[in-house]
Amino acid sequence: MFRGLVNAPYFTLLSDTSELGLCDISVEGKLIAGVFLRHGFKWGTLEGEKQGRIICAKGAHMIVENHALWGEEPTEEYPATFTYLGAEPLPDKPNGRRPAVIICGGGAFTHIALHEQDPVAFAFLDHGYQAFVLNYVTSDTGDVSFPHPQADLAKMVATVRANADEWHVDPKRVCVVGFSAGGMICASLATQWKTGPFAGLAGARPDDIRPDAVVLGYPLLDFAYVRDMQTRDPRIDLRVPKTGGKTGRDLLNDYLSMVTGDEATDEHLADICPTTHVSRQMPPTFVWGVSDDKTAPIAQVYPFAQRMAEEGVVCEMHVFDQGGHGLSLGNANTAVDNEDKQVAVRPWIRLAFRFLERHGF
């Protein structure tokens, strides 16, 4: 475990010396270099043994910890890790406890998009939350087939509650936030915390893994819908260069088999679709997406929202007119393509905070 202590939730890591530096930091020979401002976070790594300075504003202490999720160290079978970003107890709150947020970035289950992790965590930290960034299993690190990533999130929720005293967390206010593939993981837990296999896999009771609220950004919810949309493209049967003669259809089937652990039959795809399992046992859920998203089409989110409304789930949904996919906060620090198009989605986090506040956060 790496642990660092700095003097505020706003800090800058620089590779040069500074009169304002409070402490040095390096992790396993790599300097984590970054700039955090109120509206976002840019970061990278500098190779070598260089030391960096953490420059802080005055304020409450901030704690940064990196942990293996399933034991003392990550293993080949259980590779998931998480980072805890926390602040000191609130003196004016009962027991000084804060709400917790668990961040699940997207990345098509092959990796985790960094711009959907730390920037979002810091935004929630700025709003009074203790933040946890989950590095769930991906195809880069292990078996990504259902329900392994979902089990990681279930374990994360249970871990936050089990360590609520140490991390100054209110165990009755644990929110999960997911983007794209991470949104599917969060939606799966929200819909199947009681009926699915996740509690048993996490070694916990169902109540221990139930999130108290859910925020989903452009979630991937329905593999069958995405498959059907992609197979309508007439280019699907053309050979793709540098793939050993595989066609687009071959690659799509390979991907679906990777994430489903099956032959991707209609029945299996429906069974792992969160929409199939929507019930009134779901926690309050906030979901947003973009009408021009070609990767996780908004049309596959509408049935999910409709089912929630039919079941009486507390829910709120927002659809923005443009931005594409992978937007994160939609600001200059998280823009992955056309920043001008992403301006439209920036209000989502303010709307989400208001939703959460209305429901006990």
Positions of the model-derived regions?
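Short beta-strand/loop motif that positions the catalytic acidic residue
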Residues: 287-289
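Mobile cap/lid helix-loop segments that gate and shape the active-site cleft of serine hydrolases
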Residues: 225-277
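Conserved alpha/beta-hydrolase "acid-adjacent" motif
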Residues: 294-300
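Short beta-strand element of the alpha/beta-hydrolase
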Residues: 97-106
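Primarily recognizes the serine-hydrolase "nucleophile elbow" in alpha/beta-hydrolase
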Residues: 158-233
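Catalytic nucleophile-loop/oxyanion-hole region of alpha/beta-hydrolase
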Residues: 112-114, 134-171, 342-344
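N-terminal cap/lid segment of alpha/beta-hydrolase-fold proteins
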Residues: 59-95
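Catalytic active-site module of serine/aspartate enzymes centered on a nucleophile-bearing elbow/loop
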Residues: 335-361
